[in-house]
Amino acid sequence: MGVSSRARWVALGLGVLGLLCAALGVIMILMVPSLIKQQVLKNVRIDPSSLSFGMWKEIPVPFYLSVYFFEVVNPSEVLNGQKPVVRERGPYVYREFRQKVNITFNDNDTVSYIENRSLRFQPDRSQGSESDYIVLPNILVLGGAVMMEDKPTSLKLLMTLGLVTMGQRAFMNRTVGEILWGYEDPFVNFLSKYFPDMFPIKGKFGLFVGMNDSSSGVFTVFTGVQNFSKIHLVDKWNGLSEVNYWHSEQCNMINGTAGQMWAPFMTPESSLEFFSPEACRSMKLTYQESRVFEGIPTYRFTAPDTLFANGSVYPPNEGFCPCRESGIQNVSTCRFGAPLFLSQPHFYNADPVLSEAVLGLNPDPKEHSLFLDIHPVTGIPMNCSVKMQLSLYIKSVKGVGQTGKIEPVVLPLLWFEQSGMMGGKTLNTFYTQLVLMPQVLHYAQYVLLGLGGLLLLVPIIYQLRSQEKCFLFWSGSKKGSQDKEAMQAYSESLMSPAAKGTVLQEAKL
């Protein structure tokens, strides 16, 4: 086989290979997006065979609860009508462990479960210990006084007598552990005995009683196996399709997810909605910006200005009233009537009147705004920091001597941050399976298409060059034949008689 023949077959082979590569690239361009979508849907639904099921069942990411207290520096002056001065103490950090138990798959494409939660103090991450003493408003005294304000004078006098007998004061000096996880107080038994409708609490009293070694109730959520459009959405909480704490149907609705995973394939127009049993309501976060977390593209969602706006600023929130200044939410209806308010830390994004009424507050968007960074393709959180503040409304109540001359004020008690970020083996698995592989497939389809196009050019160029050589050879042969004929004619003319005479004459000259 000659050299030209081998070259022809090589060019033809490369052309066939290029055609196959180009065809495969086109097929991948048409099919890969659908394949990636199917793979994502398969792995984010709540199903024992899905990649994310283990992550959903027992969160492998270390979560931390960081608590900051607002210690009252001038309690005596506050009782005399002066402005409160507070000093931030903390953080007191707890590692949070969560595990779903009693998982039951139902026939209507839902799954029911209880999520057990436990908190363990982390001394190495904390600025202090659980034995630190902190001066705070006595919630039982000052909160109870506000709750009794419209009651008959005789009841208020009975309450005052009970407070005096038990040595209760407007402000208390207790340890971090007691404030959070509860303390024995005879006044609690007194209140539950004489005012059972107003104070249906028994045993220990603490701000976070019921949050440790406990659960947030029974959740029933959609799995997304049969109906993807409802994936992760809460169907019921404790058997309820809506709560009854608020004064409008919209505010009582249980919307969104349980706050751990959301529907995949988000866009900047998507919102992040979830139901929070601790806040007794559903919340909605909005898109702020696109970011990158450890090489993974994310969307950052933050709290809009309307989250805790009052009804006059944002009419849909009217159902959460009675309201005070904008930026705080009255949660008394789900906290036994106690005048407690929820907001962002240091009254960030709230009416400035609130932070100006208390010395020592410095709202800062970098320090006090909440955010969730979500991988938009899967709806799985990569990095989150949820920050909330709990405040108590206090004032002087006529008939309750312990309230002195306290001016009406929403006084911050503490703020807390629940934070966590994906890392380690979990992050590597997530990145490889749900980010790297789709990216490889995405780029491979265009590489194959480009390579196929280049290889297809090989036989085309070879054919063009072969035709050019043939043309040059044919042209060269034709020209050579014409020159040979001309030379022969010229030689014959020289041998003729006339030509000979001419030559001799020229020689003589």
Curated annotation (Swiss-Prot):
Molecular function via GO: amyloid-beta binding; apolipoprotein A-I binding; apolipoprotein binding; high-density lipoprotein particle binding; high-density lipoprotein particle receptor activity; identical protein binding; lipid binding; lipid transporter activity
GO cellular component, one term: microvillus membrane
Topological region Extracellular: 33-440
Membrane topology (Cytoplasmic): 1-11, 462-509
Glycosylation sites: N102, N108, N116, N173, N212, N227, N255, N310, N330, N383
One Pfam short name: CD36
Function: Receptor for different ligands such as phospholipids, cholesterol ester, lipoproteins, phosphatidylserine and apoptotic cells. Receptor for HDL, mediating selective uptake of cholesteryl ether and HDL-dependent cholesterol efflux. Also facilitates the flux of free and esterified cholesterol between the cell surface and apoB-containing lipoproteins and modified lipoproteins, although less efficiently than HDL. May be involved in the phagocytosis of apoptotic cells, via its phosphatidylserine binding activity.
The protein, known as: Scavenger receptor class B member 1
Organism the protein comes from: Rattus norvegicus (Rat)
Gene: Scarb1
